[in-house]
Amino acid sequence: MRIILMGPPGAGKGTQAEKLSKELDVPHIATGDIFRKAVSEGTELGKEAKSYMDAGQLVPDDVVIGIVEERLKKPDCHEGFILDGFPRTVTQAEALDKVLSDNPLTAAVYIDVSKDELIDRLSGRRICRKCGKSYHIKFNPPQVRGVCDEDEGELYQRDDDNEETAKERLEVYLENTQPLVEYYQDRGILKKIDGTKSPEEVFRDILKAVQAKQ
């Protein structure tokens, strides 16, 4: 099963991707992680990406697509994958379709959450400075305020999670992603999921939607 998971910041993509990966026994591929791995391992594409990043420039599509393609060709992806964070543009989506021409995507899942709810979720998020574990002051608070349950690390709010920045991030995301949503809608593989339900209900809805596409 080859699935793309889409949704704005704060929609819970990471949580759902991990759950789906376990349930379907396919890898969760977060593009940020494979980028960092390619750079740290010093692969040809990783070196190329690093040269752009060091210069403060956007990494060109052909390099991004190359890094994703390298990962999708690994043996653990033969039975499928959950792709999180890619594609971000229609150009990237078209290139991905070419890469997957023999085994096309099963579904593109979009976790839909209202703007107000997303701002509430993002601005309440707190991260552990030591281990990076994520909490929420309202939905998933730590046992002791401001302290991580795992390692007693200090919890902090990321700069891009304050309310004003969260609003800006959402505007940019929604504007850039709309053409991608339409692209997968036109291809007949888009599945919109109500992301305002509990994580367990969202997971069940995603599972039902992707299994119906098999």
Curated annotation (Swiss-Prot):
Residues 124-161 are annotated as: LID. Pathway: Purine metabolism; AMP biosynthesis via salvage pathway; AMP from ADP: step 1/1. Its EC number is 2.7.4.3. GO terms for biological process: AMP salvage. Gene3D superfamilies: P-loop containing nucleotide triphosphate hydrolases. Monomer. Belongs to the adenylate kinase family. This is Adenylate kinase. The gene is adk.
